[in-house]
Protein backbone atom coordinates (compact mmCIF):
# COMPACT_ATOMS: atom_id res chain seq x y z
CA UNK A 1 0.00 0.00 0.00
CA UNK A 2 1.33 3.43 -0.94
CA UNK A 3 2.02 5.71 2.04
CA UNK A 4 -0.38 8.58 2.67
CA UNK A 5 2.04 11.33 1.74
CA UNK A 6 -0.43 14.14 2.42
CA UNK A 7 -0.94 12.87 5.96
CA UNK A 8 2.82 12.61 6.46
CA UNK A 9 3.19 16.31 5.64
CA UNK A 10 1.54 17.10 8.98
CA UNK A 11 4.57 15.61 10.75
CA UNK A 12 6.78 18.45 9.45
CA UNK A 13 5.68 21.79 10.97
CA UNK A 14 7.80 23.90 8.61
CA UNK A 15 5.56 22.86 5.71
CA UNK A 16 2.69 24.87 7.17
CA UNK A 17 4.82 28.01 6.81
CA UNK A 18 7.22 27.41 3.96
CA UNK A 19 7.57 25.71 0.61
CA UNK A 20 10.55 23.68 1.75
CA UNK A 21 12.74 22.59 -1.18
CA UNK A 22 16.07 22.33 0.60
CA UNK A 23 16.37 18.69 1.65
CA UNK A 24 19.61 18.37 -0.33
CA UNK A 25 21.12 20.78 2.17
CA UNK A 26 19.22 20.04 5.40
CA UNK A 27 16.07 17.96 5.71
CA UNK A 28 12.90 19.33 7.29
CA UNK A 29 12.51 18.63 11.00
CA UNK A 30 9.91 15.98 11.82
CA UNK A 31 7.93 15.98 15.05
CA UNK A 32 9.45 12.59 15.90
CA UNK A 33 12.98 13.97 15.57
CA UNK A 34 12.12 17.00 17.69
CA UNK A 35 10.70 14.64 20.33
CA UNK A 36 13.91 12.59 20.23
CA UNK A 37 16.00 15.69 20.92
CA UNK A 38 13.68 16.54 23.80
CA UNK A 39 13.98 13.00 25.21
CA UNK A 40 17.75 13.36 25.25
CA UNK A 41 17.54 16.72 27.04
CA UNK A 42 15.02 15.38 29.56
CA UNK A 43 17.31 12.46 30.32
CA UNK A 44 20.27 14.79 30.83
CA UNK A 45 18.25 16.97 33.18
CA UNK A 46 16.89 14.11 35.28
CA UNK A 47 19.68 11.52 35.17
CA UNK A 48 22.87 13.28 34.14
CA UNK A 49 25.03 10.69 32.42
CA UNK A 50 23.33 7.52 31.20
CA UNK A 51 26.03 5.75 29.22
CA UNK A 52 24.25 2.41 28.88
CA UNK A 53 21.31 4.10 27.18
CA UNK A 54 23.55 6.30 25.06
CA UNK A 55 25.66 3.44 23.75
CA UNK A 56 22.48 1.48 23.01
CA UNK A 57 21.20 4.47 21.03
CA UNK A 58 24.41 4.56 18.97
CA UNK A 59 24.10 0.82 18.31
CA UNK A 60 20.50 1.35 17.22
CA UNK A 61 21.72 3.89 14.65
CA UNK A 62 24.24 1.32 13.42
CA UNK A 63 21.57 -1.37 13.04
CA UNK A 64 19.05 0.93 11.36
CA UNK A 65 21.67 2.21 8.92
CA UNK A 66 22.57 -1.36 8.05
CA UNK A 67 18.89 -2.16 7.42
CA UNK A 68 18.54 0.91 5.21
CA UNK A 69 21.55 -0.07 3.08
CA UNK A 70 20.80 -3.82 3.06
CA UNK A 71 24.07 -4.42 4.93
CA UNK A 72 24.83 -5.98 8.32
CA UNK A 73 25.61 -3.92 11.45
CA UNK A 74 29.23 -5.11 11.63
CA UNK A 75 29.82 -3.40 8.26
CA UNK A 76 28.72 0.02 9.56
CA UNK A 77 30.87 2.60 11.34
CA UNK A 78 28.90 5.42 12.99
CA UNK A 79 31.01 8.49 12.29
CA UNK A 80 30.99 12.17 13.17
CA UNK A 81 30.69 13.07 9.48
CA UNK A 82 31.48 11.81 6.00
CA UNK A 83 34.79 13.64 6.30
CA UNK A 84 35.64 11.72 9.48
CA UNK A 85 34.76 8.38 7.91
CA UNK A 86 36.73 9.04 4.73
CA UNK A 87 39.76 10.25 6.66
CA UNK A 88 39.73 7.02 8.69
CA UNK A 89 39.44 4.97 5.52
CA UNK A 90 42.16 6.94 3.73
CA UNK A 91 44.53 6.42 6.65
CA UNK A 92 44.19 2.65 6.17
CA UNK A 93 45.00 2.63 2.44
CA UNK A 94 48.56 1.85 1.32
CA UNK A 95 49.73 4.00 -1.60
CA UNK A 96 53.38 2.90 -1.56
CA UNK A 97 53.09 0.39 -4.42
CA UNK A 98 52.35 0.74 -8.14
CA UNK A 99 48.56 0.57 -7.54
CA UNK A 100 48.37 4.10 -6.16
CA UNK A 101 45.80 5.93 -8.29
CA UNK A 102 42.57 7.34 -6.89
CA UNK A 103 39.89 8.24 -9.42
CA UNK A 104 37.45 11.04 -8.59
CA UNK A 105 35.07 12.96 -10.83
CA UNK A 106 34.07 16.52 -11.62
CA UNK A 107 30.83 15.85 -9.73
CA UNK A 108 32.43 15.41 -6.31
CA UNK A 109 31.60 17.36 -3.18
CA UNK A 110 34.86 19.03 -2.07
CA UNK A 111 35.50 16.60 0.80
CA UNK A 112 35.66 13.55 -1.45
CA UNK A 113 38.39 15.06 -3.59
CA UNK A 114 40.26 17.03 -0.93
CA UNK A 115 40.79 14.01 1.34
CA UNK A 116 42.33 11.98 -1.48
CA UNK A 117 44.52 14.87 -2.59
CA UNK A 118 45.68 15.05 1.03
CA UNK A 119 47.11 11.54 0.54
CA UNK A 120 49.47 12.69 -2.22
CA UNK A 121 52.42 13.05 0.19
CA UNK A 122 51.84 9.35 1.01
CA UNK A 123 52.11 8.38 -2.66
CA UNK A 124 48.56 8.75 -3.93
CA UNK A 125 47.99 9.96 -7.50
CA UNK A 126 44.58 11.58 -7.89
CA UNK A 127 42.99 11.59 -11.34
CA UNK A 128 39.88 13.62 -12.14
CA UNK A 129 37.32 12.31 -14.63
CA UNK A 130 35.94 15.28 -16.53
CA UNK A 131 32.44 16.14 -17.69
CA UNK A 132 31.43 15.80 -21.30
CA UNK A 133 30.24 18.95 -23.13
CA UNK A 134 26.62 18.12 -22.24
CA UNK A 135 27.44 18.39 -18.52
CA UNK A 136 27.20 14.66 -17.78
CA UNK A 137 30.04 12.17 -17.21
CA UNK A 138 29.51 9.14 -19.46
CA UNK A 139 30.81 5.69 -18.62
CA UNK A 140 33.47 5.83 -21.32
CA UNK A 141 35.19 8.70 -19.50
CA UNK A 142 35.60 6.46 -16.46
CA UNK A 143 36.73 3.57 -18.66
CA UNK A 144 39.54 5.75 -20.02
CA UNK A 145 40.73 6.67 -16.51
CA UNK A 146 40.50 3.39 -14.57
CA UNK A 147 43.44 1.04 -15.13
CA UNK A 148 45.55 -1.61 -13.39
CA UNK A 149 47.29 1.08 -11.33
CA UNK A 150 43.99 2.26 -9.83
CA UNK A 151 43.58 1.50 -6.14
CA UNK A 152 40.25 3.25 -5.55
CA UNK A 153 37.43 4.82 -7.52
CA UNK A 154 35.82 7.38 -5.19
CA UNK A 155 32.65 8.79 -6.70
CA UNK A 156 29.52 10.62 -5.71
CA UNK A 157 26.16 9.01 -6.34
CA UNK A 158 24.36 12.29 -7.08
CA UNK A 159 26.14 15.55 -7.86
CA UNK A 160 25.41 18.25 -5.29
CA UNK A 161 25.57 21.02 -7.92
CA UNK A 162 23.31 19.79 -10.70
CA UNK A 163 21.47 16.70 -9.41
CA UNK A 164 23.05 14.36 -11.98
CA UNK A 165 23.32 10.70 -10.94
CA UNK A 166 26.29 8.66 -12.11
CA UNK A 167 26.02 5.20 -13.66
CA UNK A 168 27.15 3.48 -10.48
CA UNK A 169 26.60 -0.14 -11.62
CA UNK A 170 28.63 0.51 -14.76
CA UNK A 171 31.44 2.23 -12.87
CA UNK A 172 31.54 -0.59 -10.29
CA UNK A 173 31.93 -3.16 -13.08
CA UNK A 174 34.78 -1.16 -14.62
CA UNK A 175 36.56 -0.73 -11.29
CA UNK A 176 36.31 -4.37 -10.24
CA UNK A 177 37.33 -5.63 -13.69
CA UNK A 178 40.61 -3.74 -13.24
CA UNK A 179 41.13 -4.82 -9.62
CA UNK A 180 40.18 -1.48 -8.05
CA UNK A 181 37.89 -0.85 -5.09
CA UNK A 182 34.85 1.44 -5.24
CA UNK A 183 33.73 4.07 -2.73
CA UNK A 184 30.32 5.70 -3.12
CA UNK A 185 29.54 9.05 -1.50
CA UNK A 186 25.77 8.73 -1.20
CA UNK A 187 25.08 11.77 0.98
CA UNK A 188 22.97 13.37 -1.77
CA UNK A 189 20.94 10.21 -2.36
CA UNK A 190 20.60 8.10 0.78
CA UNK A 191 17.04 8.31 2.09
CA UNK A 192 15.71 9.66 -1.21
CA UNK A 193 16.65 6.64 -3.32
CA UNK A 194 16.54 2.94 -2.51
CA UNK A 195 20.20 1.94 -2.06
CA UNK A 196 21.33 -1.67 -1.76
CA UNK A 197 25.09 -1.81 -1.20
CA UNK A 198 25.11 -5.56 -1.88
CA UNK A 199 23.19 -5.34 -5.15
CA UNK A 200 25.46 -2.49 -6.25
CA UNK A 201 28.52 -4.55 -5.21
CA UNK A 202 30.06 -1.61 -3.34
CA UNK A 203 33.25 -1.90 -1.32
CA UNK A 204 32.67 1.29 0.67
CA UNK A 205 29.88 3.84 1.04
CA UNK A 206 29.63 7.02 3.09
CA UNK A 207 26.78 9.33 4.00
CA UNK A 208 25.21 11.38 6.73
CA UNK A 209 21.95 11.94 8.53
CA UNK A 210 21.10 15.60 8.04
CA UNK A 211 19.60 15.58 4.54
CA UNK A 212 17.14 12.97 3.28
CA UNK A 213 17.52 10.84 6.43
CA UNK A 214 15.80 13.59 8.47
CA UNK A 215 18.35 13.61 11.32
CA UNK A 216 20.92 16.25 12.12
CA UNK A 217 24.51 17.29 11.47
CA UNK A 218 27.41 15.76 13.38
CA UNK A 219 26.64 12.10 12.67
CA UNK A 220 27.20 9.93 9.62
CA UNK A 221 28.17 6.45 8.52
CA UNK A 222 30.82 4.52 6.66
CA UNK A 223 29.94 1.15 5.13
CA UNK A 224 32.87 -1.25 4.66
CA UNK A 225 32.41 -4.59 2.91
CA UNK A 226 32.86 -7.27 5.57
CA UNK A 227 35.55 -9.17 3.65
CA UNK A 228 37.75 -6.04 3.50
CA UNK A 229 37.64 -4.98 7.14
CA UNK A 230 40.51 -7.09 8.47
CA UNK A 231 42.88 -5.89 5.73
CA UNK A 232 42.40 -2.22 6.65
CA UNK A 233 43.92 -0.78 9.82
CA UNK A 234 43.22 2.96 10.17
CA UNK A 235 45.89 5.15 11.71
CA UNK A 236 43.23 7.82 12.13
CA UNK A 237 41.68 6.20 15.21
CA UNK A 238 40.56 6.61 18.82
CA UNK A 239 39.36 4.75 21.87
CA UNK A 240 35.92 3.89 20.47
CA UNK A 241 37.66 2.18 17.55
CA UNK A 242 39.36 -0.34 19.82
CA UNK A 243 38.37 -3.98 20.25
CA UNK A 244 37.79 -3.46 23.99
CA UNK A 245 36.66 0.10 24.60
CA UNK A 246 36.39 -0.25 28.37
CA UNK A 247 39.87 -1.76 28.72
CA UNK A 248 41.38 1.75 28.54
CA UNK A 249 44.54 0.08 27.22
CA UNK A 250 47.33 2.57 26.42
CA UNK A 251 49.94 -0.04 25.49
CA UNK A 252 48.96 -0.41 21.84
CA UNK A 253 46.41 -0.02 19.06
CA UNK A 254 44.07 -3.01 18.95
CA UNK A 255 41.28 -2.16 16.51
CA UNK A 256 37.82 -3.69 16.62
CA UNK A 257 37.25 -6.67 14.37
CA UNK A 258 34.32 -4.98 12.65
CA UNK A 259 33.73 -1.60 10.99
CA UNK A 260 33.82 0.11 14.38
CA UNK A 261 37.59 0.29 13.81
CA UNK A 262 36.82 3.25 11.51
CA UNK A 263 35.29 5.25 14.38
CA UNK A 264 37.28 7.45 16.75
CA UNK A 265 36.18 9.15 19.97
CA UNK A 266 33.08 9.47 22.11
CA UNK A 267 29.89 9.26 20.01
CA UNK A 268 27.78 12.35 19.41
CA UNK A 269 25.07 11.27 21.83
CA UNK A 270 22.43 13.92 21.18
CA UNK A 271 22.84 13.48 17.44
CA UNK A 272 22.28 9.74 17.72
CA UNK A 273 18.83 10.38 19.20
CA UNK A 274 17.90 12.49 16.18
CA UNK A 275 19.49 10.08 13.71
CA UNK A 276 17.62 7.10 15.17
CA UNK A 277 14.28 8.91 14.91
CA UNK A 278 14.97 10.03 11.35
CA UNK A 279 16.06 6.57 10.23
CA UNK A 280 12.98 4.98 11.77
CA UNK A 281 10.76 7.48 9.95
CA UNK A 282 12.39 6.84 6.57
CA UNK A 283 12.33 3.07 7.01
CA UNK A 284 8.67 3.17 8.02
CA UNK A 285 7.74 5.05 4.85
CA UNK A 286 10.05 2.85 2.78
CA UNK A 287 12.74 3.98 0.37
CA UNK A 288 11.18 2.29 -2.69
CA UNK A 289 8.00 4.35 -2.18
CA UNK A 290 10.04 7.46 -1.39
CA UNK A 291 12.08 7.05 -4.57
CA UNK A 292 8.96 6.68 -6.71
CA UNK A 293 7.34 9.71 -5.08
CA UNK A 294 10.43 11.87 -5.44
CA UNK A 295 10.93 11.01 -9.09
CA UNK A 296 7.32 11.95 -9.82
CA UNK A 297 7.72 15.34 -8.13
CA UNK A 298 11.04 16.19 -9.77
CA UNK A 299 9.75 15.09 -13.17
CA UNK A 300 6.75 17.39 -12.79
CA UNK A 301 8.95 20.27 -11.70
CA UNK A 302 11.28 19.88 -14.67
CA UNK A 303 8.37 19.70 -17.09
CA UNK A 304 6.82 22.85 -15.64
CA UNK A 305 10.14 24.71 -15.85
CA UNK A 306 10.32 23.80 -19.54
CA UNK A 307 6.88 25.33 -19.99
CA UNK A 308 8.03 28.69 -18.60
CA UNK A 309 11.16 28.51 -20.80
CA UNK A 310 13.59 28.31 -17.90
CA UNK A 311 14.71 24.69 -18.10
CA UNK A 312 16.70 22.83 -15.49
CA UNK A 313 20.21 21.59 -16.27
CA UNK A 314 19.51 18.35 -14.38
CA UNK A 315 19.34 15.26 -16.63
CA UNK A 316 15.77 14.27 -17.39
CA UNK A 317 16.15 10.47 -17.30
CA UNK A 318 15.46 8.83 -13.92
CA UNK A 319 18.65 6.78 -14.25
CA UNK A 320 20.72 9.93 -14.59
CA UNK A 321 19.31 12.14 -11.86
CA UNK A 322 18.61 12.32 -8.16
CA UNK A 323 16.10 14.50 -6.32
CA UNK A 324 17.61 17.93 -6.91
CA UNK A 325 16.37 20.12 -9.75
CA UNK A 326 19.11 22.62 -10.61
CA UNK A 327 18.15 25.80 -12.44
CA UNK A 328 20.82 28.10 -13.92
CA UNK A 329 20.75 31.79 -13.02
CA UNK A 330 22.91 34.83 -13.64
CA UNK A 331 22.62 35.54 -9.90
CA UNK A 332 21.81 32.31 -8.10
CA UNK A 333 22.36 33.79 -4.65
CA UNK A 334 20.05 36.69 -5.38
CA UNK A 335 17.43 34.36 -6.83
CA UNK A 336 17.52 32.09 -3.78
CA UNK A 337 17.13 35.15 -1.55
CA UNK A 338 14.13 36.38 -3.54
CA UNK A 339 12.53 32.94 -3.34
CA UNK A 340 13.00 32.97 0.42
CA UNK A 341 11.15 36.29 0.61
CA UNK A 342 8.25 34.36 -0.90
CA UNK A 343 8.63 31.64 1.74
CA UNK A 344 10.24 29.22 -0.72
CA UNK A 345 13.35 27.67 0.80
CA UNK A 346 16.01 26.59 -1.71
CA UNK A 347 19.80 26.71 -1.85
CA UNK A 348 22.32 27.77 -4.45
CA UNK A 349 25.58 26.21 -5.62
CA UNK A 350 27.67 27.93 -8.25
CA UNK A 351 25.42 29.34 -10.96
CA UNK A 352 22.46 27.14 -10.03
CA UNK A 353 19.53 27.37 -7.65
CA UNK A 354 18.71 23.95 -6.24
CA UNK A 355 15.19 22.77 -5.51
CA UNK A 356 15.60 19.49 -3.61
CA UNK A 357 12.45 17.41 -3.24
CA UNK A 358 11.55 14.78 -0.65
CA UNK A 359 8.48 12.66 0.03
CA UNK A 360 6.92 15.35 2.21
CA UNK A 361 6.69 17.74 -0.73
CA UNK A 362 3.67 17.79 -3.02
CA UNK A 363 2.42 19.14 -6.33
CA UNK A 364 1.45 22.46 -4.74
CA UNK A 365 5.11 22.95 -3.79
CA UNK A 366 6.05 22.44 -7.43
CA UNK A 367 3.50 25.00 -8.58
CA UNK A 368 4.55 27.57 -5.96
CA UNK A 369 8.18 27.24 -7.00
CA UNK A 370 7.47 27.44 -10.74
CA UNK A 371 5.12 30.42 -10.34
CA UNK A 372 7.78 32.32 -8.41
CA UNK A 373 10.43 31.42 -10.98
CA UNK A 374 8.18 32.70 -13.76
CA UNK A 375 7.85 36.03 -11.96
CA UNK A 376 11.61 36.29 -11.33
CA UNK A 377 12.85 35.14 -14.72
CA UNK A 378 13.36 38.62 -16.11
CA UNK A 379 15.75 39.60 -13.33
CA UNK A 380 17.45 36.29 -12.57
CA UNK A 381 17.21 34.12 -15.69
CA UNK A 382 20.22 32.34 -17.16
CA UNK A 383 23.15 34.28 -18.58
Task: Map each language-model feature to its residues.
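Pyridoxal 5′-phosphate
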Residues: 1-383
Amino acid sequence: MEPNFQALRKEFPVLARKTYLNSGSYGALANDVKAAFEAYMEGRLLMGANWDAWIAKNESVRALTAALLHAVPDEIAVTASVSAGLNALASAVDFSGPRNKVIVSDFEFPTNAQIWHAQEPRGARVVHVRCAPDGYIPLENFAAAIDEQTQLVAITHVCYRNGAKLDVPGIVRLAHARGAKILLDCYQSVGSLDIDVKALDLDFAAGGMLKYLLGTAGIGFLYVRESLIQSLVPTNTGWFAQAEIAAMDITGNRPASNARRFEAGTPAVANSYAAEAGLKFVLAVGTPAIEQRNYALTRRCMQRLEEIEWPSITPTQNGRRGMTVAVPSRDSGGLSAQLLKRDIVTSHRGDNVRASFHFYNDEDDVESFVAAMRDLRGSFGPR
